Amino acid sequence: MTNIRKTHPLMEIVNNAFIDLPTPSNISSWWNFGSLLGICLILRILTGLFLAMHYTADTATAFSSVTHICRDVNYGWIIRYMHANGASMFSICLFMHVGRGLYYGSYTFLETWNIGVILLFATMATAFMGYVLPWGQMSFWGATVITNLLSAIPYIGTNLVEWIWGGFSVDKATLTRFFAFHFSSPFIIAALAMVHLLFLHETGSNNPTGSLSDMDKIPFHPYYTIKDILGALLLILTLMLLVLFAPDLLGDPDNYTPANPLNTPPHIKPEWYFLFAYAILRSIPNKLGGVLALVLSILILVLMPLLHTSKQRSMMFRPISQCLFWILVADLLTLTWIGGEPVEHPYIIIGQLASITYFTLILVLMPIASTIENNLLKW
């Protein structure tokens, strides 16, 4: 008798993706973040669905509907905070996942990598639109400032901004469309994630050494299912610690004040996971230049396969590149810190230096280091 999981059309897909999938025997915990992102996405779609049942996308009632969810709905507070803090967990997993891809040279899987970059953009757009929905001060002014950046585009900029706003300022039309897009985009992200996985399974997973592992593979289940379950438990534990003990730790106090178009907060800033890009944006005095730098700070990931000059795929045996990679991580942490500080001395110059360092490391120093390491191999 043949096994149903290998013959049934639907079960076969699941079997080939999660059970009998040939997986390198030496992949480390850095390979856990893909499954953790999947768990984050499912968790956030479910909590978002329950929030949408009680939320009203109207400027007059949006803020009070969020208050109503927290105060009157059964377990509404935990659903709301799991959704909000889930965004932070999602972002941490995303950064770790991308960082692992950079470190171990996973960007040589071109289709998988490029779809991953599209997924990153889609997730950032979704998170931004979600931040606008509670209609607090930072929601309103964040939406105003970030959408206004599009006005820097020559010729069509102003028309484009007014088209997105649905009027001459951020108002009811903007909130309604942001809710519509925020509700639908996670399903697009889920579909893209499926395509991401499809292309990954065409080539098979990379491994820490970056070498071919066809001769030494093991089935995904039970070895990596148990490993992923451990990762999932740690993720949920961290999330619940955040939700139950410090739910507002990563939020902005200004968002507990209803949106007021007549009163600008002293310091407008996005959520913490956008601060690195926001710091790069602010470090360039010219508006269009800042917007281009902001987009390029993420789009630069697409160039990684072209900038790869090393004969080795992974950084595991490349000490100079390793050193530069960790300097890049420190630089991103510096940018995150600067993005949350006011625009004054010495933060301006630190932000500008960190921004220059970011692009120089990726575009110049890392390819040079790889070439030096290639020559060292000849010794």
Curated annotation (Swiss-Prot):
GO terms for cellular component: mitochondrial inner membrane; respiratory chain complex III. Heme b b562 binds at residues 83, 182. Binds 2 heme b groups non-covalently. It is a multi-pass membrane protein. The chain crosses the membrane at residues 33-53, 77-98, 113-133, 178-198, 226-246, 288-308, 320-340, 347-367. The keyword Mitochondrion applies. Pfam families: Cytochrom_B_C, Cytochrome_B. The keyword Transport applies. One of its GO terms (biological process) is mitochondrial electron transport, ubiquinol to cytochrome c. PROSITE patterns: CYTB_CTER, CYTB_NTER. It is found in: Mitochondrion inner membrane. Keywords: Electron transport, Heme, Iron, Membrane, Metal-binding, Mitochondrion, Mitochondrion inner membrane, Respiratory chain, Transmembrane, Transmembrane helix, Transport, Ubiquinone. Belongs to the cytochrome b family. This is Cytochrome b. It comes from Raphicerus melanotis (Cape grysbok). The lineage of its organism: Eukaryota, Metazoa, Chordata, Craniata, Vertebrata.
